[in-house]
């Protein structure tokens, strides 16, 4: 049932978060067109987007990440040596769609008529979500990013030297646990109500 799922989320928050803080920037440049940087030693650039895996039954969102070489947060040794369209996928993604190494997986843009083909080079078992990982350089090539463009930072400590105005969202482990707690709370009372209804 639902509360079990929430317990699962709570115990797997680190499986949904690669670092204690995830900062997504509004843009990689500030208002003066200067590249946004941080002095924080924990901070690591990353890219992310969401693509859709289409099937007859439903279109499912897949998180796509560009990960820094020798990342401290997503430890996939071979990532930087992969070819442009080669990727690692989360084991949950592989299991759900029966994908194995060497398979080609096709994903689409949600709102544009654009499709990408990726070749599965390996699996990453530390992520609970349906996700796909590539090196940050390959991500830039695949999605045709501008030279210094990136999505944000992963960090295990709070980043204090980036102007709030430049940050689109900050996600912390605390947020995810809190979200699960709130859901648990609202679902909990809803479930009791539902059980009473069933008895009537």
Cite the ranges covered by each PLM segment.
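Selective detector of the "anchor" transmembrane alpha-helix that sits immediately C-terminal
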Residues: 194-200
């Amino acid at each position: 049932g639902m509360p079990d799922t929430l317990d699962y989320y709570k115990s797997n928050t680190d499986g949904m978060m690669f670092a204690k803080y995830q900062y997504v920037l509004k843009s990689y440049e500030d208002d003066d067109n200067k590249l946004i940087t941080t002095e924080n030693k924990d901070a690591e650039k990353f890219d992310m987007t969401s693509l859709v895996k289409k099937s007859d039954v439903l279109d499912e969102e897949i998180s796509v990440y560009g990960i820094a070489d020798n990342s401290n947060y997503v430890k996939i040794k071979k990532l930087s040596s992969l070819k442009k369209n080669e990727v690692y996928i989360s084991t949950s993604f592989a299991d759900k769609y029966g994908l194995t190494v060497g398979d080609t997986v096709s994903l689409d843009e949600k709102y544009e008529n654009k499709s990408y083909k990726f070749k599965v080079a390996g699996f990453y078992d530390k992520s609970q979500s349906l996700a796909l990982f590539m090196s940050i350089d390959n991500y830039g090539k695949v999605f045709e990013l501008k030279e210094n463009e990136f999505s944000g930072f992963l960090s295990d400590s709070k980043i204090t030297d980036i102007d709030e105005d430049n940050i689109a969202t900050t996600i912390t482990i605390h947020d995810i646990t809190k979200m699960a707690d709130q859901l648990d709370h609202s679902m909990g009372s809803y479930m009791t109500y539902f059980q009473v209804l069933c008895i009537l």
